[in-house]
Structures are given as C-alpha cells and as structure tokens.
Amino acid sequence: MFSINANMKSIVSDFRVDQMMRYSLFVPRLYNLCRSLGFESGNIMPSRAFCSDENQGFPIILIAKHFGAFPFNHGQVGGIVATDRHAPHAQHGKDMVIIQASHVGYNPETETFGHYTRRQTLDNHTTTTCGKIGDVIQWYLDEYHFAQNNIFLGQEGDIHTITIDNQLMDGTRSEGLFLNLEKMILMKNGQQSLLRSLSTSRVYVVSEEFCKTLPDDICSARQSTCIGKHLGPDLFVYQRPISSHNEGYNHLELNLIKQMPWIVTSHEPMLVAAKINTQVEFDRTFRTIVKAQGYWGKNLLFISCLNIDISPQEGQLFPLTKCVPWAAYIQSSDGSSYTLEQSEIVERLMQQSSENTEQIDMEAAIQQMIDAQGIKIIV
C-alpha cells in the first residue's frame, strides 16, 4: 500500500487515536447508521475480521446483541481479513456489514500501549497485545537496538567520526538492518571516507549534513557516544526473506516490513504497528470487495478500526474496549458507492443515536432456546 518513499510520519499521524469511542457506543451507532442507509432490520449479516484473542470477545458479543446475529468470521490472527470468505459471507444475508480491526492493549496506570492483563491466569500476568504483532516486530526491534548500541559518534581533532560495527557493514547478509550509509558517511568521489579499520568495526568521517541533524554535544563529543535514539527511520531499511503468500502466515509481517523503521523508532511501537496494519488492511480489502461478485447488488458497509483493549479491573469480566474508526466503504444495492475518511465516518457515527431500540435481549434469547422443545436428530 505504502511506497518506500512515503512520508510515514504524516501517514501515521493522519490516523488520529483521539477519535475513539467505547464499543458499547460504537456498535449501536454503527447499527443505526446501517439502518439510516436502508439496511433492513433482521436481514443484516455482520462479519468481523478480528484477531483471535479472547479480549476481542466482548466486541463480538455487542455486535451479536445489536445486529441480532452472531457475526460471520472474516478474520485471521492479527486482524488480517480473509478475503476468500467474501463469497460465503455474501450468501448468508441480504445486507452486509464487515468490521475489520487490529488491536492493541493499553495500561491506564502507566499510560502505555501494548500490554493486557490475563485475568484467567493464576497470577493475572500481563502479556504483549496484540501478541501476533508483538511477535512480528520483536526481531526488528532487536536488530534496531543492536544498531543503536553499536554505532558510535565522536570527534578526533577537527574530524567528526562515526564508528560502525562490521556486522552492520556486511552487505552480503540475507536479512537484517541495512544502513543508508550515504546519509551518514562523508563520500569522496563515490567512496566512503574510511579513517581506519578496527578488530570488529570501522571508523569513518561523518557527513556534514548528518552532523547538522545531531545535537552539538553528540557529534562533537571527544568520547565516543552511542548513536541511540538519533538513529532515525530515514537512516536504515530492513531486508528479510518473507513468504509472499497472500493472507498466509507472514501476511501481517508483509503489511509492516516497509514501515518497520517508523515502527521501531516510535515511542509506542505496538500502537503504530496496529495503526499501520489497519490502514493497509482497509485499502487491500476494499479493493477485493468491489470485485467480489457476491456483494454486487447488495447494501454493504465495510469499516476498519483500531480496537484498544483496557484490561478488566477487579470484579469485571470483560475489557473496556474502545474503537477508533479509520475509514469506511459504503455500497448501495443500486450500485452506487463511496468511501468515508476518518473524520467523515466518525462524524456520521456521532450523528447516530447510541440507543438501539431493535437490539435483542441476549438473556431472553438464550432462555428461549433453553425452553424450546427438543428436536430428535435421526441418523
């Protein structure tokens, strides 16, 4: 979706997390929006493309309660949309709704993203959330931390120097973090200005342009200083052989790899990764929906969101999940269609009532099935 030269800082900041609402408000508003678009009560087949994490269960319950049907499963681990399920989903209802969401945990005490407390464990321990996203980005974080701690800036006489570990200079590697050396090292006649080779590293002359981007106390330090946080996202790329099978095991990683420099250098890597995955999945899925013949001639609403999971407090069974809508695609049965950007879909949702007079009574519906006369199955 994003080119390697895209302004990722702008792209990520365009996804405003402050445009959030509780799921208990989001779902009835979404239902009422569908009804305002001509969707018929009792004939709407919702579908969700959520991660398989148990903390996504509460949103699913709310979808069932307000739409009157348990949502079809359109999702894979990590919030990836299984687009090969469009056809069966289209056969299950008159009007169609698809809700895609990546998710990330949030700790209100530390005001940080990426973790969730598991109440069903003996010690209520906290784990990375989304676990799939955490697993995917960890290798990239490790590579970044190695580079941060093995590139040194200093000064020898009047010469500003940069010392780089030999591993980072090995261009024959099949995978790893690769530096944009032309932005960091002084080049003369197309050659890197090498001062000396050490046992495990090399010392170069820093480019004047790069030096200008650094604080004076870093670039001019007489004692070598780790580059640390000054290794910005424009100074490196990642390479890694990944299976390109669409919607396969590595699909989430494929969504993120080009944006990894911005993810690992951000203050909240898990949040940024979840936002980017939501953005990529909306763009990708939208293009498959418009080509899916099963959806032609149907009312359809597809929305992509970021789910923020706040761990349940003592005495609570479910998380306080908040939804951050990103974008929506709306199609009418007459063939007309349009997309809504974040501010537009949020505005449309906020115009809807948070009360749904057509929601089902879950307890009554369950009791009805408990009380129903048994049916003998003949084999």
Tell me the role of every PLM-derived stretch:
Residues 1-44, 68-70, 77-95, 106-379:
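Divalent-metal-activated hydrolytic enzyme cores
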Residues 50-55, 104:
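Short glycine-enriched loops at secondary-structure junctions
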Residues 54-57, 311-312:
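Short, acidic Gly/Pro/Ser/Thr-rich loop/turn segments
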Residues 56-60, 83:
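Short, well-ordered alpha-helical microsegments
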Residues 61-68:
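Short Gly/aromatic-enriched secondary-structure transition segments
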Residues 97-103:
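Active-site neighborhood of phospho(di)ester-bond hydrolases with catalytic His/Asp-centered motifs
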